[in-house]
Amino acid sequence: MEEIIINGKCLYSSKGAAREYGPVGCNFYRGCPFQCTYCYNRRGLTAPVLGVDHAVLEDCFTKEKNRPKKYRDISAETYAMIVFKRELERHLDYCRQTGIFFSFSTDPMLDETHPLTWRAVNYAVQKQVPVTVLTKCAFTFELHNDWFGKNLDYHQGLQKYVSFGFTLTGRDDLEEGAARHFSANSDRIKAMSQLKELGYNVWASIEPVIDLDSSFEMIRESLPYCDHYKIGLQSGVAKGYYGSLSKLTRFILHVRKAIAEYPDVTVYWKESVRKELAGTHVDEHLKHPQFIGGGFEWVKKKEGI
């Protein structure tokens, strides 16, 4: 597949660590009420813009001066959807191969963000474009649109193309920035089990690994309901943060042993892990039939897309 660089208002080509989640992302909003202490959006030069404590629809949609005159009398959300449709049509064949990731700059299932997210997801599915949603909001599925109460026909129309991911750190104490949005890690695993029962592809982002024991416990508890894991280390920490190389080795071997009981489960070890192990004997442990590439490869393999 020839790479296409997308630089739209909604869709864009991801870079660096973000690309390991998917080559194409969609960001309607920036900011997040969780204010997790480890969030990469809260660090660096872009923190005042991306790290705000509430979700904000991007200026390119909200400010009239940024819109063509014929679109200035409609809502910002409606205009955002028009732009999304136009950009997706322009890159349709490519996005059918890469899928679309929601979202790198906010949680797409917040009260404020999920209505527009779902308009976009449903449109993408109509166009046979796979999408994946990464969230910490387990309760959104129950509170909005009676998600688990919908008839099976509704879910069958989405199952092949929509995958749900949940961030699992095992450290609720670092994620309680906004009580009205907060879902404990245990609540997220419960939502994973319900979505799995409905036939969806379900995955977990074990990133960042804040401490090895907590992360492994999240993997162990979620394994019956999870199709895929993406595991990455915490950025910006001091060398030796995870202790000796032998501790990281044991973590990898424990993961290998745990997933062996679930042969259809796959794992992607992010570059942060592979870089930590480069040049050591331990990187041999990352060679395993259930350890695969990043992006949407696990969904495409599973669904035959």
Segments (PLM) and residue ranges:
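Intrinsically disordered, low-complexity regions
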Residues: 1-3, 8, 57-58, 68-71, ...
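N-terminal [4Fe-4S]-dependent radical SAM core
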Residues: 1-79, 83-99
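Feature targets compositionally biased, intrinsically disordered low-complexity regions
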Residues: 7, 15, 98, 156, ...
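Residues in flexible loops and secondary-structure boundaries
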Residues: 32-34, 47, 110, 217, ...
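General N-terminal targeting signals
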Residues: 43-45, 49, 55-56, 117-119, ...
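Residue-level detector of family-conserved "landmark" positions at structurally sensitive sites
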Residues: 49, 134, 205, 269-270
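Conserved AdoMet/S-adenosylmethionine-binding subsite of the radical SAM
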Residues: 79-259
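C-terminal accessory extensions appended to soluble enzyme cores
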Residues: 244-305
